[in-house]
């Protein structure tokens, strides 16, 4: 069984956001892409982790049990990325550039 980070992140985002569309926006996917990731994970696990409703999604009892593990997997992935960046001598984060409005128009 291969439980990859992208599929775990899709479930975590859907659970946090409450809809597949919001999860897709958060992760930079299309809603159908998120649905495919979740569906493939559920197929591999052999049970559903999300219930799809007209108003959004919610975790199944099995999904609630698995969510902490999915969160650990996604957190570990982020730690690996940050540590690798530090080893390479690069720090990750946002860069904010401020420009005065009269200069920005040129």
PLM feature spans:
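A short LG(V/I)-centered, amphipathic sequence patch enriched
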Residues: 42-59
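Short helix-boundary/capping micro-motifs
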Residues: 13-28
């Amino acid at each position: 069984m291969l439980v990859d980070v992208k599929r775990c992140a899709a479930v975590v985002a859907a659970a946090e956001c409450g809809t597949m569309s919001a999860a897709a926006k958060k992760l930079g996917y299309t809603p159908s892409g998120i649905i495919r990731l979740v569906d493939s994970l559920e197929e591999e696990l052999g049970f559903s982790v999300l219930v799809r409703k007209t108003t959004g999604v919610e975790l199944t009892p099995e999904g609630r049990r698995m969510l902490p593990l999915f969160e650990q997997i996604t957190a570990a992935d982020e730690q690996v990325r940050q540590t690798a960046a530090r080893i390479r001598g690069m720090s990750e984060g946002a860069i904010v550039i401020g420009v005065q409005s009269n200069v920005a128009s040129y």
